[in-house]
Every structure is written in C-alpha cells, then in structure tokens.
Regions:
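Ferredoxin-reductase
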Residues: 2-91, 148
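Structured catalytic/translocation cores of nucleotide/phosphate-coupled proteins
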Residues: 1-7, 18-20, 28-31, 107, ...
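FNR/FR-type flavoprotein reductase catalytic core
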Residues: 72, 78-238
Length: 238
C-alpha cells in the first residue's frame, strides 16, 4: 500500500461549519471523478498498527484538472479527535492520503442521471458535475437534489440550474420536501440514481426508490461492492 504524504495548500471556509482542504498533488498520484481516499493525520502509522482514530474515509471534491486534491468536510461540535486535530491544521501542514478508489464514476449510458445527497455529501458529486460540464457525451441530463437542514447550501456557484447544459440543481431544507421530490424523480423508470449521505440516509432513499419501482441496478452508492448487500437486504423486488 502506497502512502502519499502531502501538504495543505489552501483552506477554504465554505460555510460556518464546512471547510475544503486543498492538498498538493503528489507526483504520480491520479484519480477520477467520484473518487474517495483515506486521509491520515500525523502519527496515524507511528505504532505497530495504524491508529484508526487518526484516519477517515473522505471523498475527493475536485478533478485532477483543478491541480489540487480537495477534501470537503463538516465540523459539527462536539468534534471527534480526528476533526479536532484536522480543524487546527494550517496551510503547510502534512497529511497522508492512501487507498484511493472510485465507486461512483459518471456512467455514460444515454440515460438521465439523478444525484441525491445529504449535506456535505454533495462534495462527492461536485467533480461528477464538472466532468459532465466538460463533456456531456452519452449523458442525457443531470438533476441534483440536496437536503441540508442548515440552509447553508454548498457549491452554489456550480450547483445552479443551467437549462442550456441540461442540468438542474435543487436544494431543500426538510425531509418532507426532499422525499416528495425523490418520488417525483423516480417517475423516470430508466434513470440512474446516485445516493450519497449517512447510512440511514442511503437506506431511506433506497427504500423510497425501490417502492417506486427503481431496480437496484439503477442505484449507485459510494460503497465498496462487498458492502452493498446490507443496503439492499430488504427485498422490494417488483
């Protein structure tokens, strides 16, 4: 397993609770849209075994063409040990990245794509949308729906409806409106539905989508293949 140590190049305060850390790109480090990585803080591998409390699984919120590895995360008090340390790091501090992989690349199957996210989960979809804007080949349209109870919606400069690009962005701040909209979107029985958020959020979305007749093959989760069965364990086959 290769561990890349790199430096924080810039810290962006997206909202009062959310920051994006832009990391220098190590030589020969590559990724594609929809990737996640493991972020390790200083000392995580100092002992015989890795200190898991100093490691987190994070989505990469940038594309390689942007020249930085973006890690976007929410700091909600009380913070974990990991978030407390990360929140105190400055530009120039070193962090480690390793085990980078993508479960949710943008599928180009001549279908409509629906991006369903909760809060900072939207960061996973930022590079997918940017990649779509660069090249829309074999993607009919993209519709993003994000729920964030704080009302401090993220990346609104990118997630703004653009009819000329066949892109729709919606933000809601309550569950009732959110799930009503999900049911409406599920009227497209041939669409591809990407879902990113907490495990509870994933399960609830899958339940609603499956009840509307969406097949599990049409639902994309940012989870390793071996983790998928627990999310689809409730058989709602039509």
């Amino acid at each position: 397993m290769q561990i890349y140590w790199t430096k924080i190049n810039k810290i962006i305060e997206e909202t009062p609770e959310v920051k994006t850390y832009l990391l220098d790109v190590p030589e020969d480090f590559t990724w594609e849209e929809g990737s996640h990585t493991h972020l390790g803080l200083e000392g995580f591998n100092a002992g015989d075994k890795p200190n898991r409390s100093l490691v987190r699984h994070m989505s990469i919120s940038t594309l390689p063409s942007e020249g930085a590895i973006g890690i976007t995360t929410r700091f909600r008090k009380p913070c974990s040990e990991f978030k407390t340390i990360l929140g105190n790091l400055d530009v120039g501090s070193e962090v480690a990245i390793f085990k980078t992989h993508t479960n949710v690349p943008l599928k180009r199957e001549d279908k409509n794509v629906y991006l369903l996210s909760s809060g900072v989960g939207l960061a996973t979809f930022r590079p997918l949308v940017l990649e779509y804007f660069k090249c829309a080949d074999n993607v009919n349209q993209i519709h993003s729906l994000n729920i964030d109870s704080t009302k401090d919606f993220l990346f609104t400069n990118i997630f703004t409806s653009a009819p000329d690009k066949n892109f729709t962005a919606q933000f809601v701040d309550n569950r009732k409106d959110y799930y009503e909209k999900v049911k409406n979107l599920a009227g497209d029985k041939d669409g591809l539905f990407y879902v990113v958020g907490s495990e509870k959020f994933l399960v609830q979305n899958i339940e609603v989508l499956r009840e509307q007749g969406i097949k599990k093959e049409q639902i994309m989760l940012d989870k390793h293949e071996k983790e998928l069965p627990k999310f689809f364990s409730v058989d709602l086959s039509i």
